[in-house]
Every structure is written in C-alpha cells, then in structure tokens.
C-alpha cells in the first residue's frame, strides 16, 4: 500500500504570505523541461510551490523520504503521482509498478512516455525533498526521464542542494527554470506582510525591514521570531538580533531555548514522540503518544505554529517541517532514549493495523526488536517478496539472528528464494543444507518439500537436469495441493527436465499443467514460462502452426499482465523469429529478433547473443554475406567475452558454420572442428543442433564418412523421440552430403523425404540456405513432373526464394561476368563468334534459375512474346534446341568460371 500523504500536495494555509513575484516566475514553468527550486532548509520551497500548484488539476505531487532510495518504492510513488495528475491515463505503467514487471527504471519510464504521448494537455510532476535521494541508479533514471519526457510535461524538483540531474546541460539549452535561496529570501514587503499576519500588534515597516535584514530573509527565522514573540511577550526585534547570522546547522540550541523550553511538558513529549513518524494521522498519534484525540492534538499543534503542516486536503495526514522534524528526532534520541524502542514498537503496531507492513518494518528495525520484526515477516514477507521489496526484505532478514531463522524455517526459505532471484545459486544450497542440519527436532515434511522445489529450480538453472528431476519428484510427492507456489515450481522444473531429455509428450503435458495452475493462482511469470516451453516443444515435434498459436497466447498474456519488460519477452520474440525464419518470412523474422534485442536493452550485451545469431541467419537466407559478416563480428566478439549455456553456443555456432560453408572457408571450419567438444548424447533438439553443426563442418571439409555416421545416428534418435523438425533439418544436410559425394540417387531420395516432411513443418528457409546445390536438384524434380501437388508447390516456392536471394551469386549474367567470360581462354568458339546480347544473357540466367517464360517476362518487365524472341535467338546462338540443354550449357559456363554448381 502507498501512504496517501506522500502523494498529497501540502495544504495552503490562510496566514501564509503569497509570493507574487516568485509565482509570476513559476507561471512560465510549462515552457521548461525542469523547474528547479533549491535552497537550504526553511526558505519556503514547499510553501511556494504549493501556492503555485493550487488550482492546477493536472499536477502530481510526490513527497520523498529516505525510504524512497529503494528503486521499486520510488517508481511506485512516481507513477502513482502521475496517475493522480492524469486521472488514471497511465494504467499500463501503473500495473507494471504494482507487479514489479519492469527491468529497470529507465525501461519503465520508456513505457510511461509511450502512454503520455497520447496526453496532449500541460502536465506537471512535483518531487519534493529530492536531496534525500542518494541512490545513483535513481539519479541516472531521472536524467533519462528529463531527456525523454514529453514536451507538455514539466518536472518540478525541490531540493536543498543541486541534484545530479544534468543541470548544466539543461541550462545551456534553455530548458531549465531556476529559483534559488537568494530569490526565495523574503524581501522587506513580504516580511512586513508576514509579521502583520502572525503578530497581534503591528510593527513598523522600518523595524520589520531591519529584522528581515538581520536574518537575511530566512523564512524559518522569521517564523521563529514571531513564535518567540508570542510565547514570551519578548520584542520581535530582540529575537531577531539573536537569530542574526545563525544558520540551520547551529539552529538546534535556539530551537531548544526558544521553542521546546517554552512549551508545557505534555506538548514537549508530544512533539518528541510524534517526530519519529515520517507522516502521521489520528490513529498513529493515539498509539504513539497516548493522546486520546490525536486529530484534535495535531490541529492544536498546527495552530500554535509549531512547524506542523497538513499533507492532504482532508486534513487527515500531517508531517513536521523537515528542519524541525530532524531537530525533534535528534532531541528524542537524547531525551527519551530509554523510551524510544517502545515508541517505535507502538508506531510499528499502528502501521501494521493500518495495513502498511513496510513502514512497520522500518520502526521494528529502529526499535531493534527482533521478535516484532520476525512476526511482521512471518505474516507479510511473502507478499513483500511477490511485490519485489527485495532490498527491504534482505535488510530485515540480516537483522534477525540465525537462531530466529532456524525457529521459523519458512524465513530461511524466503532468504533462499531471495538468493535465487539474485542468481546466487551456490549460496542457496549452502543455506538450505545448513538450515536442515541445524534445525532442532524433526523437520516438517511439507517444508522439506518446499526446500526441494527450490533446490530443483536451482539445479535446472545450473544445468543439472538429473538432480533437478530427482528433487522435483520428491517435492511433488510430499507437497499438499494447497501449497500451490512450490507445486507450480516443481511441476515446471519436471516438465523442463523431460524437455531436455527428449520426452516431449510428457513434457508438453506437464507444461500445460503448469500453465493451468499458474493462471489459476495468478503466478504470471510461470504461466508465461510454461507457454514458451510448450511452443518450443511443439516446434520440435514439427507442429509449427500449433507452436505459432501457443505463441499468440503468450503475446496475449504479456499484453494483459503487462509483462513486456521481463526477459522472457525476449525469449518469446526469439522463438517467434525462429518460426518466421523457417517459413521464409525474413523481414518479419528480423523485426522480431530486433524487438527481442530491444527488450534486453537494459541488460548486458551478452544477453543479446541468440537474437543476434538470428539476424545473421536472416542475412544468410537472403544471401547477403557482407551484412552477415558484419553481424558475425559482433556475435563472435560476444562469444569471446562471456559464459553461455550450451544451446546458446550451438545456435551461435550454427550461423558461423553455415557462413563458412557459403564462403568456402575450410580453414575456419577445420579450426572450429578441432576445438569443439562433441556432446555425449543427441536426445533433444539442443544437442541435435550442435551435432548437426559438426556434420556440416565435416561435409565442408570433405569428411563424408564421419558426417554420414553422425547424421544417421541423429536421424535414428530424432525418429525414436519424434523430433520431427530436427529430422527435417538432418535430411536436408544428408542430402547435401550425398550430392557433394556424387550419390545423386541417395540425394534425391532424402530430398523427397525432406519435402514430404516439410508439409508438416512448413520449412522453407532450411532448404533455401543450401543455395544453388538445392536449386539444381529442385529444378530437376520439377522438370520430371513427378512430385505430388503439395511437394511440387513447395519446391517451386523454395526455388523462387533461392532465385530471389542467391541468384546474384550463381546465375546472374551481369555485364562484368559476361566480359570476364568472353575473355576466358576456354570460352566456346560459338559464343565468341556469335555473342549474345546483354538481354539474352539475362534471359539465360533466369532460365538457368528455373524461371518460366511468364516469370522471366515479369522479372524483366517486357511482353511474353518478346521473351520468346529472346529465347529463340539465344538457342540459335548457343546451338541448343531445348530448355534443359540451355540449363546444362549455362551450368558448364558457370563451372568454367569457377562457380561450384
């Protein structure tokens, strides 16, 4: 819960002086990105800005305290303030902060600005007491905020010092409105108005001016003069002389003498006790001070001018002026030292009663009461964990003695989950093992099962599937149905293990169970994870359309639950890109991979490896080797500067080996093959992929026997485990092996199998990537006219893709190529004596690429009759009678020129 008073603009009091000259300056704030009001304590920053804010409906106010250095807390209040200002316009951002579903403050602000782009009226956000922020991450995020905020949004910052917000840059660009302590200091006219409203007897203007000069226009000093004069019947000028030259750091003695020593004992104790509260209401005051009517007492203190200010229009919430509150808290530590722990306990109990466990923890820590802290955590820790109050939880658990954790082992479990969330896997197991060893008496079976569920998650994250499976099964055997979170974890881990072991049907079933349980209990990150796993399994089984539909469910879940900034969103964009690539929708695949990289913009560059590999893959499918090389340079740099899971390395190696194949780089392939470890098994699609990389490198190096042994074993495993997509890929690679080894019949046999299987998988680009060798075989199959209708259609589609993306390498007879050909010593005499025109060379290239007459006419934008004339002429010049003869003639010319066709 958010404390309402922190989001309420201070109430304007009747007796305050209206600072017309400063309000006039602030009236132009909407023309600036930042309005900055800075001065030491007590110069009236908050009062001035609250006067300016009066009547502005589209304004959010956020009053900071020390606890707002926690990023999650800062974000929650900032978004809530803007929600108040816009009447709930930023609903997506609000859900994201409530569920902590954002990667960083900057990514959250980026989402916020997307929503605010549709808000066209002037908008203001006031952040008070910014000097309390010491977290550099928040400073960085607010600099990002200022750089990218919409033009119609003005940020108003109140601070005792110059904040680290890139002020100089804003000043140079004339995007900064500044008001400092010299401008905030009262002038003679304002001082006269102030005393006239505060003192029962008016004073002369000259005396008022002298007092203003004595204290250099410091508003707090003027207030103290008026307070002292009322309390002691002293002359105001006498108080002014004493305050002359004083500053905030030396104010304590004065406040003791002139304020605390001049109130009755009851009021003094009230001030000291209530000062421990950062904000207060009736219930808190009654519990902390023992007063019977807290609201009445607060209003009385306010009337006495004792630096108490209302924080909302209802008058329910109050706080002390920061300068006076700090002074009172210091005096409380000195004067009420023995009572202070009890006062903090009372505050904690009252905050708990009002439903604010975070504030209660703050006071329990201050009280040093481990028992109270333990009780609060036992009742509220998991709620705080689910809302990502991780820093507060970590501080709280560290404050508890180890013996207390052992007596309440669920707190040990919480501490272990905290470590797991921070990827401190080895520490998790150490902590749980120590706890199990030292817990007195028999350990509860359910708790032991919860320990095992967490251990299972750690084991699978750490790449130990056998141990993960053992622990997940133990957990599921012992966990009651009501312990839903741990059951979700254990079921998910078991399903993931089966996925790794190639037991796809059982894995799919468990992941569907995980999804159902997670949706039922609103555990959205596990619901999303289960959908991603289901999609990968369906893809591996060859059911790409079903995988697509599962991905659609995942996209919908992300949208509904605002999960866009979770790293799993990148996973979804990546597997969508893989699917689009398989279907030769290359532009969409590339866009999806780039979107995945955008999701990871706040993470280390190494996290982008998989999406970067997909960008290389798109370039390779297009035959764009220059672009592929540029992207490969980035990919290989990342590979050399990080530690990666084996399947990440396999995907990166795949595009490297294909690139070497397409460029004939046998040296790189041989070097890679020497240093690449060979997996022990091939029982899932990750391991199949790496073995396929090895076989492709072996084929490139002419090691056909070794490659055939690998591929035959891969096919055997793929058939037994129903890894149909892998089988489709393996058949295509086996086809290339047979083709290059001169085993044309075997090559045709496995190509026919691959085409038939592609009716299920929908594969296109996996064929295209094999280039001209694949094109030649498909041309022959099409010309034989023996393919079934579906396979015939797919073969034609694949051939069109190869022609589109790879023709420039193999069959595009451009002017440069023709010139080199005619100068070649072995060029046929017929071509030398009766050369083709440039257009006829183009037509020959398109015939060789498998184009029909109509397609050639469309490609060259001429009439079909014109194409027939060109074909008749080139047949005559080449001395051929049929289309197949022309294809063979073009092939001989390409071979003569050194093309490996």
Swiss-Prot record:
Activity-regulation annotation: Activated by ATP and maltotriose, which are both required for DNA binding.
PROSITE patterns, per database record: HTH_LUXR_1, HTH_LUXR_2
Binding site for ATP: 39-46
Keyword terms: Activator, ATP-binding, Carbohydrate metabolism, DNA-binding, Nucleotide-binding, Transcription, Transcription regulation
SUPFAM superfamilies the record matches: C-terminal effector domain of the bipartite response regulators, P-loop containing nucleoside triphosphate hydrolases, TPR-like
Top-level division of the source organism's lineage: Bacteria
GO MF annotation list: ATP binding; DNA binding; DNA-binding transcription factor activity
GO terms classed as biological process: positive regulation of carbohydrate metabolic process; positive regulation of DNA-templated transcription
CDD domains: LuxR_C_like
Database matches in InterPro entries: P-loop_NTPase, Sig_transdc_resp-reg_C-effctor, TPR-like_helical_dom_sf, TPR_MalT, Tscrpt_reg_HTH_MalT, Tscrpt_reg_LuxR_C, WH-like_DNA-bd_sf
UniProt keyword Repeat present: no
DNA-binding region: 853-872
Domain HTH luxR-type: 829-894
HAMAP family: HTH_type_MalT
Quaternary structure and partners: Monomer in solution. Oligomerizes to an active state in the presence of the positive effectors ATP and maltotriose.
NCBIfam families xref list: PRK04841.1
Functional summary from the UniProt entry: Positively regulates the transcription of the maltose regulon whose gene products are responsible for uptake and catabolism of malto-oligosaccharides. Specifically binds to the promoter region of its target genes, recognizing a short DNA motif called the MalT box.
Family that this chain belongs to: Belongs to the MalT family.
Name of the protein described by the UniProt record: HTH-type transcriptional regulator MalT
Organism per entry: Citrobacter koseri (strain ATCC BAA-895 / CDC 4225-83 / SGSC4696)
């Amino acid at each position: 819960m958010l404390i309402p008073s922190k989001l309420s603009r201070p109430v304007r009091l009747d007796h305050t002086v209206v600072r017309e000259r400063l309000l006039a300056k602030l009236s132009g704030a909407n023309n600036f990105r930042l309005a900055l009001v800075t001065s030491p304590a007590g110069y009236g920053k908050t009062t001035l800005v609250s006067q300016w804010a009066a009547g502005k409906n589209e304004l959010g106010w956020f009053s900071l305290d020390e606890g707002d250095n926690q990023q999650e807390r800062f974000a929650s209040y900032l978004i809530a303030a803007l929600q108040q200002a816009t009447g709930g316009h930023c609903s997506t951002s609000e859900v994201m902060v409530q569920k902590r579903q954002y990667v960083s403050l900057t990514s959250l602000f980026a989402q916020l600005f997307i929503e605010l782009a549709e808000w066209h009226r002037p908008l203001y956000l006031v952040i008070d007491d910014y000097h309390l922020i010491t977290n550099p991450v928040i400073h960085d995020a607010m600099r990002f905020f200022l750089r990218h905020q919409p033009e119609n949004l003005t940020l108003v910052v109140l601070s005792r010092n110059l904040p680290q917000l890139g002020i100089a840059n804003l000043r140079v660009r004339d995007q900064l409105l500044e008001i400092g302590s010299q401008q905030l200091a009262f002038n003679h006219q304002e001082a006269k108005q102030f005393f006239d409203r505060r003192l029962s007897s008016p004073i002369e203007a000259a005396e008022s001016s002298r007092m203003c000069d004595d204290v250099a226009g410091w508003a707090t000093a003027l207030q103290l003069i008026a307070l002292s004069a009322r309390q002691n019947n002293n002359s105001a000028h006498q108080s002014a002389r004493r305050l002359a030259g004083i500053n905030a750091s030396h104010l304590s003695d004065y406040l003791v003498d002139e304020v605390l020593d001049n109130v009755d004992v009851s009021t003094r104790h009230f001030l000291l006790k209530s000062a421990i509260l950062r904000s207060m209401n009736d219930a808190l005051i009654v519990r902390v001070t023992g007063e019977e009517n807290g609201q009445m007492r607060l209003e009385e203190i306010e009337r006495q001018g004792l630096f108490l200010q209302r924080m909302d229009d209802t008058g329910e919430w109050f706080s002390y002026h920061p300068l006076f509150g700090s002074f009172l808290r210091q005096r409380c530590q000195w004067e009420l030292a023995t009572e202070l722990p009890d006062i903090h306990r009372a505050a904690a109990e009252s905050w708990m009663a009002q439903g604010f466990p975070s504030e209660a923890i703050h006071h329990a820590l201050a009280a040093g009461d481990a028992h109270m802290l333990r009780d609060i955590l036992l009742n509220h820790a998991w709620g705080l964990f689910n809302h990502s109050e991780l820093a507060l939880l970590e501080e709280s658990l560290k404050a508890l003695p180890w013996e207390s954790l052992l007596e309440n082992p669920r707190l040990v479990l919480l501490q272990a989950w905290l470590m797991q969330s921070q990827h401190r896997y080895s520490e998790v197991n150490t902590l749980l093992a120590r706890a199990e060893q030292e817990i007195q008496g028999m350990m509860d079976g359910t708790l032991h099962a919860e320990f095992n569920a967490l251990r299972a998650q750690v084991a699978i994250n750490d790449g130990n599937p056998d141990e993960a499976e053992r622990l997940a099964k133990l957990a599921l055997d012992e966990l009651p149905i009501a312990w839903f979170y741990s059951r979700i974890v254990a079921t998910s881990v078991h399903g993931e293990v089966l996925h790794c072991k190639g037991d796809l049907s059982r894995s799919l079933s468990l992941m569907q169970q995980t999804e159902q349980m997670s949706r039922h209990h609103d555990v959205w990150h596990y619901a999303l994870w289960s959908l991603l796993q289901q999609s990968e399994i369906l893809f591996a089984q060859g059911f790409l359309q079903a995988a697509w539909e599962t991905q659609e469910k995942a996209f919908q879940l992300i949208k509904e639950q605002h999960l866009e900034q979770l790293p799993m969103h990148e996973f979804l964009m990546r597997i969508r890109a893989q699917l689009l690539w398989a279907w030769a929708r290359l532009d969409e695949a590339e866009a999806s991979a780039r979107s995945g990289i955008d999701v990871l913009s706040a993470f280390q560059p190494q996290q982008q490896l998989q999406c970067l590999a997909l960008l290389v893959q798109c370039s390779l499918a297009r035959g764009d080797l220059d672009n592929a090389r540029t992207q490969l340079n980035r990919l290989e740099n990342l590979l050399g500067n990080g530690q990666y899971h084996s399947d990440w390395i396999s995907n990166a190696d795949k595009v490297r080996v294909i690139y070497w194949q397409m460029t004939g780089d046998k040296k790189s392939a041989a070097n890679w093959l020497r240093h690449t470890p060979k997996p022990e098994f091939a029982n899932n699609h990750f391991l199949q992929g790496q073995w396929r990389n090895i076989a492709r490198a072996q084929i490139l190096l002419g090691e056909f026997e070794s490659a055939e042994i690998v591929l035959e074993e891969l096919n055997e495993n793929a058939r037994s485990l129903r890894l149909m997509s892998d089988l489709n890929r393996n058949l295509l690679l086996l086809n290339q092996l047979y083709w290059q080894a001169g085993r044309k019949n075997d090559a045709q046999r496995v190509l026919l199998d691959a085409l038939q299987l592609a009716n299920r998988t929908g594969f296109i680009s996996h064929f295209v990537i094999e280039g001209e060798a694949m094109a030649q075989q498909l041309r022959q199959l099409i010309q034989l006219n023996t393919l079934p209708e579906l396979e015939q259609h797919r073969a034609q589609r694949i051939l069109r893709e190869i022609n589109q993306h790879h023709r420039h390498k193999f069959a595009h007879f451009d002017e440069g190529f023709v010139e080199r050909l005619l100068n070649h010593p072995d060029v046929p005499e017929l071509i030398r004596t009766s050369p083709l025109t440039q257009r006829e060379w183009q037509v020959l290239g398109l015939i060789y690429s498998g184009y029909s007459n109509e397609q050639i006419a469309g490609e060259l934008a001429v009439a079909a009759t014109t194409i027939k004339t060109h074909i008749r002429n080139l047949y005559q010049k080449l001395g051929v009678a049929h289309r197949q003869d022309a294809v063979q003639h073009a092939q001989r010319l390409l071979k003569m020129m050194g093309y490996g066709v």
